[in-house]
A protein has these predicted regions:
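Catalytic-core elements of nucleic-acid end-processing and repair enzymes
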Residues: 392
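N-terminal localization/anchoring segments of enzymes in phospholipid and broader phosphate metabolism
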Residues: 1-310, 314, 318, 358, ...
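Phosphate-/nucleic-acid-contacting segments
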Residues: 322
Length: 472
């Protein structure tokens, strides 16, 4: 009897492995990912089955379902909002901008003011001032929140805003902020702040969808001012963590119609997390005196396309003279790697700035496996020396730049909900150029000899680490 049960169990495990392999074949977004999962599920189903159901599913089906329901619940609000936006929409001047609009499913807006916020002190002073000036409502969304000195100051500012009658909606990622105690939010809730986790495993049906995260960092005040970028809430983002030292990051402060794009992304996330449709201001404010054009590009695992990866590839292909990129994690998919190499081969000044110090060791090691190909193609790789580099910024020629939350890795491309602000404006690009030139002055350039001279065991470890790139 016991042997029959064991045999039946083994047969069922292998059958489930075969069924899951077919699912991986039909749903994986890359051929490399499909091959890796199929081989693992058929050969080692005892280990691969739980890994696949926890980490291997490429789309966030719960969010997809919620988007379908939105057709009945939210479409009327979106229609009114888009009608209000018509006077503030610019016709795309080039096919490149048109492609970004198509990926974003949001329009290019005019009459915006985009301002760079460099490093933590300037960013949080700006954010806290925005909280203090809020009159009607506040929308806040972060990946990581800590109950340290900075987190306590944020909480105090929110409590003060709530007491003067401001409606506050606070969304956080339940995995990114898993170390935060419940008492932090309970105090806010007692003051009337509405708080919700963004959890991809919400509900019995979606209990295995643990690998999707909401990596967006957004704040919107009254539908008139918005902030987006790389900063989470914790003292390490002020450069006060002994392990990381000085923290180099970039945020963006935005005024104008583009703010409503940030608001729409938050609004949709809030609806997924809570089921609520919150009442917000959808009337755009135009700042014609500082006419930056802006497209807000949300991306995530519920999209029909790999929006983040396609956006990066489009921006690379649009560069004619210069493409400067900064990212804390640099393990791009094959499409982005090929686009970067081709850009360098056609004479574009391609520079990639990455940290000298590792934050996530597996991701750090993975990069060594393909850096030689990058360097041989003419791409210049720089490592930022003082502290940890966390900014996600791109500069395209003298004409456009992006600031957002997307890292150049598979997690940002396919597993995380992210957001990018694309600003096709020469004056804004000049500001980004000045900022990055200062950063490059604090970097060292990586040589191909440095990579090739690494011991064999380190090369083997890097190649092995790279195999895990689809789920890093």
């Amino acid at each position: 009897m016991t042997s029959w049960l064991i045999g039946t169990g083994i047969m069922l495990i292998h059958l489930m492995g075969m069924i899951s392999a077919v699912m991986a074949l039909m749903s994986s977004r890359t051929s490399q990912g499909a091959v890796a999962w199929i081989m693992s599920l058929l050969t080692f189903p005892y280990v691969a089955l739980p890994a696949y159901w926890l980490f291997g599913r490429p789309r966030f089906y719960g969010y997809v379902t919620a988007r379908g329901a939105r057709d009945n619940v939210l479409r009327r609000v979106l229609r009114r909002y888009r009608n209000n936006m018509k006077p503030h929409i610019s016709l795309p001047a080039t096919p490149d901008i048109q492609a970004v609009e198509q990926l974003a499913m949001m329009p290019l807006t005019k009459g915006n003011h985009a301002e760079l916020l460099i490093d933590g002190q300037a960013t949080f002073e700006h954010l806290f001032r925005g909280i203090d000036e809020a009159c009607d409502y506040l929308l806040l969304q972060f990946f990581i929140i800590r109950d340290d000195r900075l987190g306590k100051e944020l909480k105090a500012r929110l409590v003060a805003a709530a007491r003067r009658g401001v409606r506050i909606y606070f969304l956080y990622d339940e995995l990114g902020s898993r170390k935060l105690r419940d008492s932090y939010f309970k105090e806010l809730e007692r003051e009337g702040v509405e708080v919700s986790p963004f959890g991809s495993s919400r509900g019995f049906k979606h209990r295995f969808q643990l690998n999707f995260r909401n990596h967006r960092k957004i704040m919107v005040v009254d539908g008139k001012k918005g902030w987006v970028g790389g900063f989470n809430v914790g003292i390490e983002y002020l450069g006060e963590h002994p392990r990381h030292g000085p923290w180099r990051d970039t945020h963006l402060a935005l005024k104008g119609p583009g703010v409503l794009g940030l608001q729409e992304a938050f609004w949709e996330d809030w609806h997924w997390a809570t089921g609520e449709v919150i009442s917000l201001n959808w009337h755009a404010e135009n700042h014609a005196q500082m006419d930056h054009q802006v497209v807000i590009v949300p991306s995530g695992p519920a999209d029909k396309h790999d929006t983040a990866s396609l956006l990066i590839q489009q921006l690379i292909h649009s560069a004619n003279d210069r493409l400067w990129v900064t990212s804390p994690y640099f393990v791009p998919d094959q499409g982005v790697q090929d686009a970067l190499r081709l850009a360098a081969m056609r004479g574009v000044d391609v520079r990639v700035m990455i940290p000298e110090r590792p934050d996530h060791l597996l991701v750090f090691l993975s990069a060594f496996s393909f850096l030689p190909d990058m360097l041989r193609a003419g791409i210049k790789i720089y490592r930022y020396l003082p502290g940890f580099l966390h900014q996600k910024v791109m500069l395209i020629d003298d004409e456009a730049a992006t600031v957002g939350t997307v890292n150049l890795d598979n997690r940002s491309f396919r597993l995380n909900f992210e957001i990018t602000t694309y600003v096709p404006s020469a004056s804004f690009a000049a500001d980004v150029e000045a900022m990055l030139l200062e950063d490059f002055s604090r970097c060292r350039r990586v040589s191909i000899d440095e990579i090739n001279s690494r011991p064999l065991w380190k090369k083997v470890v890097s190649r092995a680490a790279y195999l895990t790139a689809p789920i890093q």
